C-alpha cells in the first residue's frame, strides 16, 4: 500500500512539474511610446549625425564590435534605416549631433523645439546648407497624417521642400511612363513645408519639380515605382545652384506606410 502511495505521489509531482514547465509565462514589458517619428539628414555639407530627443539618443548605428559606430546618419540618409522610431508625447528639443570622434563629437548642429502629440506620426529634417563657421544647419518638422489604405489601386503621395536656396515655390509633378498622364502633387510648396497627400495610380513615374513661373525642371528623378495602397513622401534636398554631384538637387522617396 505504501509503495502505491509513493508511486502516486511521484506521478503527481511529475504532472505538477510538467504543468509548471509548460505554463504560460508573463514576460516583462514596457509601454510603447505613443507617437512615431522619422529623422533625415538633408543638411547640404553637414557632417554625419545621431539624432536626439532631449538628451535621449533615438538613432545610432552599431559596429561589428558591438559598440556604437561613429559613422552616424550621413547627408541624404534617414535615421534608423528610414523607419519610424517611437517617441513619447510632449515637449521635446530635437537635435542632430555630430557623430564622429573628435573635439566636436556630440555637438548639436541642428536644434528644434517640438510638441509631439499622442498617436501621431512626424518627420524631422535637417535642411538647408550647413554653415561651417557657426557649425549649424536648419531644421524643421512636419506631421505625417498616416492612415490605413482605402484604395489599393492608388498610392498617396506628398512633397516636402527642404532646399533652402530655391528662389521660388516648387511644385512636384509625376509623369506616368506608361500612359504619359501627369499628376500634380499638391501645389506650390515653400521651403520647410509639405503638401497634402495626393492620390496617384500605381505605376512607374518620372518625378520633377519646377518653379511656379517656369517650365524648366529644377530637380528630377526617373523610374520611381509607386505601389498601390502605400503612402510616400518625396523630399527635395540639395543646393539649387549646383548642377551635378552629391550636393546637387535630388528627390528622395520614402515610404510612410
Q: What residue spans do the PLM features occupy?
A:
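Sec-dependent bacterial lipoprotein signal peptides
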Residues: 1-19
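Intrinsically disordered, low-complexity polar regions and short flexible loop motifs
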Residues: 19-257
Amino acid at each position: 500500500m505504501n509503495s502505491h502511495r509513493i508511486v502516486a505521489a511521484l506521478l503527481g509531482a511529475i504532472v505538477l512539474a510538467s504543468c509548471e514547465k509548460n505554463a504560460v509565462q508573463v514576460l516583462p514589458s514596457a509601454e510603447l511610446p505613443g507617437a512615431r517619428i522619422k529623422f533625415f539628414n538633408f543638411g547640404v555639407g553637414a557632417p554625419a549625425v545621431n539624432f536626439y530627443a532631449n538628451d535621449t539618443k533615438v538613432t545610432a548605428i552599431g559596429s561589428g564590435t558591438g559598440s556604437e559606430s561613429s559613422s552616424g546618419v550621413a547627408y541624404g540618409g534617414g535615421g534608423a534605416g528610414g523607419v519610424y522610431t517611437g517617441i513619447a508625447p510632449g515637449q521635446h528639443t530635437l537635435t542632430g549631433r555630430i557623430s564622429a570622434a573628435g573635439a566636436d563629437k556630440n555637438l548639436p548642429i541642428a536644434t528644434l523645439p517640438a510638441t509631439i502629440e499622442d498617436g501621431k506620426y512626424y518627420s524631422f529634417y535637417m535642411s538647408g546648407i550647413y554653415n561651417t563657421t557657426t557649425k549649424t544647419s536648419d531644421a524643421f518638422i512636419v506631421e505625417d497624417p498616416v492612415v490605413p489604405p482605402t484604395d489599393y489601386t492608388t498610392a498617396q503621395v506628398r512633397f516636402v521642400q527642404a532646399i533652402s536656396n530655391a528662389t521660388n515655390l516648387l511644385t512636384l509633378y509625376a509623369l506616368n511612363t506608361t500612359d504619359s498622364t501627369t499628376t500634380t502633387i499638391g501645389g506650390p510648396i515653400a521651403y520647410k513645408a509639405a503638401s497634402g497627400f495626393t492620390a496617384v495610380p500605381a505605376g512607374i513615374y518620372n518625378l520633377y519639380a519646377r518653379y511656379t513661373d517656369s517650365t524648366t525642371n529644377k530637380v528630377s528623378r526617373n523610374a520611381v515605382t509607386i505601389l498601390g495602397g502605400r503612402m510616400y513622401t518625396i523630399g527635395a534636398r540639395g543646393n539649387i545652384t549646383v548642377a551635378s554631384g552629391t550636393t546637387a538637387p535630388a528627390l528622395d522617396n520614402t515610404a510612410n506606410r
